[in-house]
Amino acid sequence: FTGLRIPNNIALSKLNLKAATEDLNKAKEDISISVTSAYLQILFNEELAKVAHNQVELSREQLELKEAYFKNGKASEAEVYEARARVAQDEMSAVQADNNYQLALLELSQLLELPTPDGFGVVSPRVEDDFTLLSLPEDIYAQAVLNKPSIKAAQFRLEGAAKNIRIAQSSWYPQLNFSAGIGTNYYNISGVENASFSSQWHQNFNKYLQFSLSIPLFNRFDTRNKVKNARIQRTALSWKLEESKKALFKEIQQAYYNAVAAESKYKSSNTATDASEASFRLMSEKYANGKANATEYNEARTNWMKTVSDMLQAKYDYLFRTKILDFYKGVPLTLE
Protein backbone atom coordinates (compact mmCIF):
# COMPACT_ATOMS: atom_id res chain seq x y z
CA PHE A 1 0.00 0.00 0.00
CA THR A 2 1.46 3.36 -1.07
CA GLY A 3 -1.34 5.75 -0.22
CA LEU A 4 -2.97 5.22 -3.64
CA ARG A 5 0.06 6.76 -5.33
CA ILE A 6 0.22 4.13 -8.07
CA PRO A 7 -3.43 4.38 -9.27
CA ASN A 8 -3.22 8.19 -9.11
CA ASN A 9 -0.03 8.12 -11.18
CA ILE A 10 -1.78 5.95 -13.75
CA ALA A 11 -4.78 8.30 -13.82
CA LEU A 12 -2.44 11.30 -14.20
CA SER A 13 -0.67 9.68 -17.14
CA LYS A 14 -4.01 9.04 -18.85
CA LEU A 15 -5.09 12.66 -18.34
CA ASN A 16 -1.76 13.93 -19.69
CA LEU A 17 -2.25 11.74 -22.76
CA LYS A 18 -5.75 13.14 -23.28
CA ALA A 19 -4.44 16.71 -22.95
CA ALA A 20 -1.66 16.01 -25.46
CA THR A 21 -4.22 14.53 -27.85
CA GLU A 22 -6.32 17.69 -27.61
CA ASP A 23 -3.19 19.78 -28.26
CA LEU A 24 -2.74 17.76 -31.43
CA ASN A 25 -6.37 18.35 -32.38
CA LYS A 26 -5.84 22.09 -31.82
CA ALA A 27 -2.88 22.00 -34.21
CA LYS A 28 -5.05 20.18 -36.75
CA GLU A 29 -7.71 22.87 -36.39
CA ASP A 30 -5.16 25.62 -37.01
CA ILE A 31 -3.96 23.83 -40.13
CA SER A 32 -7.56 23.40 -41.35
CA ILE A 33 -8.20 27.13 -41.00
CA SER A 34 -4.96 27.99 -42.82
CA VAL A 35 -5.78 25.58 -45.65
CA THR A 36 -9.32 26.95 -45.95
CA SER A 37 -8.04 30.52 -46.07
CA ALA A 38 -5.47 29.61 -48.74
CA TYR A 39 -8.11 27.74 -50.74
CA LEU A 40 -10.50 30.70 -50.71
CA GLN A 41 -7.63 32.97 -51.76
CA ILE A 42 -7.15 30.72 -54.80
CA LEU A 43 -10.83 31.01 -55.71
CA PHE A 44 -10.66 34.79 -55.28
CA ASN A 45 -7.57 35.13 -57.48
CA GLU A 46 -9.05 32.75 -60.04
CA GLU A 47 -12.15 34.90 -60.44
CA LEU A 48 -10.05 38.06 -60.65
CA ALA A 49 -8.03 36.43 -63.42
CA LYS A 50 -11.23 35.60 -65.32
CA VAL A 51 -12.39 39.20 -65.01
CA ALA A 52 -8.99 40.42 -66.23
CA HIS A 53 -9.09 38.16 -69.29
CA ASN A 54 -12.66 39.23 -70.06
CA GLN A 55 -11.46 42.82 -69.94
CA VAL A 56 -8.74 41.96 -72.47
CA GLU A 57 -11.40 40.63 -74.84
CA LEU A 58 -13.48 43.79 -74.41
CA SER A 59 -10.46 45.98 -75.11
CA ARG A 60 -9.62 43.98 -78.22
CA GLU A 61 -13.16 44.41 -79.47
CA GLN A 62 -12.87 48.16 -78.90
CA LEU A 63 -9.56 48.16 -80.77
CA GLU A 64 -11.13 46.38 -83.74
CA LEU A 65 -13.94 48.95 -83.80
CA LYS A 66 -11.50 51.86 -83.65
CA GLU A 67 -9.41 50.38 -86.45
CA ALA A 68 -12.54 49.96 -88.57
CA TYR A 69 -13.65 53.53 -87.79
CA PHE A 70 -10.16 54.79 -88.63
CA LYS A 71 -10.32 53.17 -92.06
CA ASN A 72 -13.67 54.86 -92.63
CA GLY A 73 -12.40 58.18 -91.35
CA LYS A 74 -14.63 58.13 -88.25
CA ALA A 75 -11.75 57.85 -85.77
CA SER A 76 -8.34 59.45 -85.51
CA GLU A 77 -5.03 57.62 -85.48
CA ALA A 78 -4.50 58.79 -81.90
CA GLU A 79 -7.67 56.98 -80.82
CA VAL A 80 -6.39 53.78 -82.43
CA TYR A 81 -3.09 54.04 -80.54
CA GLU A 82 -4.99 54.69 -77.32
CA ALA A 83 -7.02 51.53 -77.92
CA ARG A 84 -3.85 49.53 -78.61
CA ALA A 85 -2.22 50.85 -75.44
CA ARG A 86 -5.33 49.87 -73.50
CA VAL A 87 -5.14 46.32 -74.86
CA ALA A 88 -1.48 46.07 -73.87
CA GLN A 89 -2.24 47.41 -70.41
CA ASP A 90 -5.11 44.97 -69.92
CA GLU A 91 -2.96 42.07 -71.13
CA MET A 92 -0.33 43.01 -68.58
CA SER A 93 -3.01 43.12 -65.86
CA ALA A 94 -4.22 39.68 -66.95
CA VAL A 95 -0.68 38.30 -66.72
CA GLN A 96 -0.35 39.73 -63.21
CA ALA A 97 -3.70 38.21 -62.24
CA ASP A 98 -2.53 34.82 -63.55
CA ASN A 99 0.68 35.16 -61.54
CA ASN A 100 -1.29 35.93 -58.38
CA TYR A 101 -3.40 32.84 -59.02
CA GLN A 102 -0.31 30.66 -59.45
CA LEU A 103 1.24 32.08 -56.28
CA ALA A 104 -1.95 31.26 -54.36
CA LEU A 105 -1.75 27.69 -55.68
CA LEU A 106 1.88 27.53 -54.60
CA GLU A 107 1.00 28.67 -51.07
CA LEU A 108 -1.66 25.99 -50.69
CA SER A 109 0.61 23.28 -52.11
CA GLN A 110 3.26 24.26 -49.57
CA LEU A 111 0.73 24.09 -46.74
CA LEU A 112 -0.17 20.60 -47.93
CA GLU A 113 3.56 19.82 -48.17
CA LEU A 114 3.30 18.66 -51.77
CA PRO A 115 6.67 17.92 -53.40
CA THR A 116 5.90 20.27 -56.31
CA PRO A 117 3.02 22.56 -57.31
CA ASP A 118 3.25 21.37 -60.93
CA GLY A 119 -0.07 19.94 -62.04
CA PHE A 120 -1.74 21.00 -58.80
CA GLY A 121 -5.16 22.60 -59.04
CA VAL A 122 -8.37 23.00 -57.11
CA VAL A 123 -12.01 22.40 -57.90
CA SER A 124 -14.23 25.45 -57.62
CA PRO A 125 -17.32 24.67 -55.52
CA ARG A 126 -20.75 25.98 -56.27
CA VAL A 127 -21.11 28.95 -53.97
CA GLU A 128 -24.58 30.45 -53.62
CA ASP A 129 -25.57 33.69 -51.95
CA ASP A 130 -27.30 32.16 -48.97
CA PHE A 131 -27.66 34.90 -46.39
CA THR A 132 -28.94 32.72 -43.57
CA LEU A 133 -29.48 34.15 -40.11
CA LEU A 134 -26.22 34.01 -38.16
CA SER A 135 -26.21 32.28 -34.77
CA LEU A 136 -25.69 34.57 -31.79
CA PRO A 137 -22.26 34.54 -30.07
CA GLU A 138 -23.75 33.18 -26.84
CA ASP A 139 -25.29 30.20 -28.66
CA ILE A 140 -22.08 29.48 -30.54
CA TYR A 141 -20.03 29.71 -27.34
CA ALA A 142 -22.31 27.24 -25.56
CA GLN A 143 -21.43 24.67 -28.23
CA ALA A 144 -17.78 25.63 -28.66
CA VAL A 145 -16.88 25.43 -24.96
CA LEU A 146 -17.85 21.74 -25.02
CA ASN A 147 -15.94 20.84 -28.17
CA LYS A 148 -12.91 23.08 -28.65
CA PRO A 149 -9.64 21.19 -28.13
CA SER A 150 -7.97 24.11 -26.34
CA ILE A 151 -10.69 24.09 -23.65
CA LYS A 152 -10.70 20.31 -23.32
CA ALA A 153 -6.91 20.23 -22.99
CA ALA A 154 -7.05 22.83 -20.20
CA GLN A 155 -9.77 20.82 -18.43
CA PHE A 156 -7.74 17.61 -18.60
CA ARG A 157 -4.70 19.41 -17.18
CA LEU A 158 -6.82 20.79 -14.34
CA GLU A 159 -8.04 17.27 -13.54
CA GLY A 160 -4.42 16.12 -13.66
CA ALA A 161 -3.50 18.80 -11.12
CA ALA A 162 -6.03 17.27 -8.70
CA LYS A 163 -4.33 13.90 -9.17
CA ASN A 164 -0.97 15.56 -8.49
CA ILE A 165 -2.29 16.72 -5.12
CA ARG A 166 -3.37 13.18 -4.29
CA ILE A 167 0.06 11.89 -5.31
CA ALA A 168 1.80 14.43 -3.08
CA GLN A 169 -0.54 13.64 -0.16
CA SER A 170 0.22 9.92 -0.43
CA SER A 171 3.55 10.53 1.35
CA TRP A 172 1.60 11.30 4.52
CA TYR A 173 0.23 7.76 4.73
CA PRO A 174 2.10 4.71 6.09
CA GLN A 175 3.76 2.63 3.39
CA LEU A 176 3.21 -1.13 3.55
CA ASN A 177 5.53 -3.19 1.35
CA PHE A 178 5.37 -6.90 0.67
CA SER A 179 7.96 -9.10 -0.98
CA ALA A 180 8.42 -12.83 -1.44
CA GLY A 181 10.85 -15.12 -3.17
CA ILE A 182 12.02 -18.68 -3.69
CA GLY A 183 15.42 -19.97 -4.70
CA THR A 184 17.98 -22.76 -4.65
CA ASN A 185 21.65 -23.17 -5.48
CA TYR A 186 24.21 -25.73 -6.55
CA TYR A 187 27.94 -25.79 -5.81
CA ASN A 188 30.85 -28.02 -6.72
CA ILE A 189 34.12 -28.12 -4.67
CA SER A 190 37.18 -29.62 -6.37
CA GLY A 191 38.77 -32.61 -4.62
CA VAL A 192 35.76 -33.24 -2.41
CA GLU A 193 32.90 -35.58 -2.97
CA ASN A 194 29.89 -33.38 -3.78
CA ALA A 195 26.23 -34.16 -3.52
CA SER A 196 24.38 -34.68 -6.78
CA PHE A 197 22.63 -31.83 -8.54
CA SER A 198 19.16 -33.15 -7.73
CA SER A 199 20.07 -33.60 -4.07
CA GLN A 200 21.44 -30.07 -3.82
CA TRP A 201 18.37 -28.75 -5.66
CA HIS A 202 16.10 -30.07 -2.92
CA GLN A 203 18.44 -29.57 0.03
CA ASN A 204 19.29 -25.95 -0.83
CA PHE A 205 15.73 -24.92 -1.74
CA ASN A 206 14.59 -21.86 0.23
CA LYS A 207 11.74 -19.36 0.28
CA TYR A 208 10.91 -16.21 2.11
CA LEU A 209 8.00 -13.85 2.78
CA GLN A 210 8.61 -10.28 3.94
CA PHE A 211 6.42 -7.40 5.09
CA SER A 212 7.70 -3.93 5.94
CA LEU A 213 5.80 -0.98 7.35
CA SER A 214 7.12 2.57 7.02
CA ILE A 215 5.39 5.26 9.10
CA PRO A 216 6.23 8.88 8.14
CA LEU A 217 7.04 11.02 11.16
CA PHE A 218 9.09 13.97 9.98
CA ASN A 219 10.71 14.62 6.58
CA ARG A 220 11.62 18.30 6.98
CA PHE A 221 8.21 19.43 5.63
CA ASP A 222 8.99 17.93 2.22
CA THR A 223 5.52 16.41 1.85
CA ARG A 224 3.79 19.56 3.07
CA ASN A 225 5.70 21.68 0.53
CA LYS A 226 4.92 19.26 -2.30
CA VAL A 227 1.22 19.36 -1.46
CA LYS A 228 1.29 23.15 -1.24
CA ASN A 229 3.01 23.45 -4.63
CA ALA A 230 0.54 21.00 -6.18
CA ARG A 231 -2.38 23.07 -4.91
CA ILE A 232 -0.82 26.26 -6.25
CA GLN A 233 -0.43 24.56 -9.62
CA ARG A 234 -4.08 23.50 -9.57
CA THR A 235 -5.16 27.09 -8.83
CA ALA A 236 -2.99 28.40 -11.67
CA LEU A 237 -4.45 25.85 -14.10
CA SER A 238 -7.96 26.73 -12.94
CA TRP A 239 -7.30 30.38 -13.76
CA LYS A 240 -5.80 29.37 -17.07
CA LEU A 241 -8.95 27.42 -17.93
CA GLU A 242 -11.13 30.43 -17.14
CA GLU A 243 -8.86 32.68 -19.21
CA SER A 244 -9.10 30.21 -22.10
CA LYS A 245 -12.90 30.31 -21.89
CA LYS A 246 -12.92 34.12 -21.85
CA ALA A 247 -10.52 34.22 -24.81
CA LEU A 248 -12.73 31.78 -26.70
CA PHE A 249 -15.82 33.93 -26.13
CA LYS A 250 -13.95 37.02 -27.33
CA GLU A 251 -12.83 35.15 -30.45
CA ILE A 252 -16.41 34.11 -31.16
CA GLN A 253 -17.69 37.65 -30.62
CA GLN A 254 -15.10 39.04 -33.02
CA ALA A 255 -15.85 36.32 -35.56
CA TYR A 256 -19.58 37.05 -35.31
CA TYR A 257 -19.30 40.80 -35.84
CA ASN A 258 -16.75 40.26 -38.61
CA ALA A 259 -19.28 37.99 -40.32
CA VAL A 260 -22.05 40.58 -39.88
CA ALA A 261 -19.84 43.29 -41.39
CA ALA A 262 -18.77 40.98 -44.23
CA GLU A 263 -22.40 40.17 -45.04
CA SER A 264 -23.33 43.86 -45.15
CA LYS A 265 -20.31 44.67 -47.32
CA TYR A 266 -21.06 41.81 -49.70
CA LYS A 267 -24.66 42.91 -50.19
CA SER A 268 -23.70 46.54 -50.84
CA SER A 269 -20.85 45.55 -53.15
CA ASN A 270 -23.24 43.45 -55.24
CA THR A 271 -25.44 46.51 -55.75
CA ALA A 272 -22.42 48.67 -56.60
CA THR A 273 -21.12 46.10 -59.08
CA ASP A 274 -24.45 45.88 -60.93
CA ALA A 275 -24.64 49.68 -61.18
CA SER A 276 -21.03 50.14 -62.31
CA GLU A 277 -21.32 47.35 -64.87
CA ALA A 278 -24.44 48.92 -66.37
CA SER A 279 -22.65 52.27 -66.45
CA PHE A 280 -19.61 50.73 -68.13
CA ARG A 281 -21.71 48.97 -70.79
CA LEU A 282 -23.45 52.23 -71.58
CA MET A 283 -20.15 54.10 -71.73
CA SER A 284 -18.69 51.39 -73.99
CA GLU A 285 -21.49 51.95 -76.50
CA LYS A 286 -21.00 55.71 -76.35
CA TYR A 287 -17.25 55.33 -76.79
CA ALA A 288 -17.68 52.96 -79.72
CA ASN A 289 -20.01 55.46 -81.40
CA GLY A 290 -17.74 58.40 -80.72
CA LYS A 291 -20.07 60.00 -78.17
CA ALA A 292 -17.59 59.63 -75.29
CA ASN A 293 -13.86 60.22 -75.12
CA ALA A 294 -11.13 57.85 -73.91
CA THR A 295 -10.91 59.49 -70.50
CA GLU A 296 -14.59 58.92 -69.79
CA TYR A 297 -14.34 55.34 -71.03
CA ASN A 298 -11.27 54.58 -68.89
CA GLU A 299 -12.90 56.10 -65.83
CA ALA A 300 -16.02 53.94 -66.25
CA ARG A 301 -13.92 50.85 -66.86
CA THR A 302 -11.67 51.48 -63.85
CA ASN A 303 -14.70 52.03 -61.62
CA TRP A 304 -16.29 48.80 -62.83
CA MET A 305 -13.09 46.78 -62.33
CA LYS A 306 -12.70 48.17 -58.81
CA THR A 307 -16.27 47.31 -57.82
CA VAL A 308 -15.87 43.80 -59.24
CA SER A 309 -12.65 43.32 -57.26
CA ASP A 310 -14.30 44.66 -54.10
CA MET A 311 -17.32 42.43 -54.62
CA LEU A 312 -15.21 39.29 -55.08
CA GLN A 313 -13.14 40.11 -52.02
CA ALA A 314 -16.30 40.73 -49.98
CA LYS A 315 -17.80 37.49 -51.29
CA TYR A 316 -14.97 35.25 -50.15
CA ASP A 317 -14.45 37.20 -46.96
CA TYR A 318 -18.12 36.63 -46.10
CA LEU A 319 -17.82 32.95 -46.99
CA PHE A 320 -14.72 32.54 -44.82
CA ARG A 321 -16.27 34.38 -41.86
CA THR A 322 -19.43 32.28 -41.90
CA LYS A 323 -17.41 29.07 -42.17
CA ILE A 324 -15.37 30.11 -39.14
CA LEU A 325 -18.59 30.57 -37.15
CA ASP A 326 -19.73 27.10 -38.20
CA PHE A 327 -16.30 25.77 -37.25
CA TYR A 328 -16.71 27.11 -33.71
CA LYS A 329 -19.98 25.18 -33.53
CA GLY A 330 -18.15 21.98 -34.42
CA VAL A 331 -19.13 21.88 -38.10
CA PRO A 332 -16.24 20.66 -40.31
CA LEU A 333 -14.78 23.18 -42.76
CA THR A 334 -16.32 22.29 -46.12
CA LEU A 335 -17.54 24.23 -49.15
CA GLU A 336 -19.99 21.69 -50.50
Give the location of each predicted region.
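Small/polar, glycine/serine/threonine/aspartate-rich low-complexity segments that form flexible
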Residues: 8-9, 14, 124-133, 166, ...
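Amphipathic, heptad-repeat alpha-helical/coiled-coil signature enriched at exported N-termini
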Residues: 2-38, 46-59, 77, 81-84, ...
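Long amphipathic alpha-helical coiled-coil segments
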Residues: 107-115, 321-335
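Structural signature of outer-membrane beta-barrel domains
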Residues: 1-2, 183-187, 218, 328
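Amphipathic alpha-helical coiled-coil segments
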Residues: 27, 31-50, 68, 104, ...
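Periplasmic alpha-helical coiled-coil/stalk elements that build and connect Gram-negative outer-membrane
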Residues: 30-143, 258, 262, 304
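Metallo-beta-lactamase
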Residues: 97, 149, 314
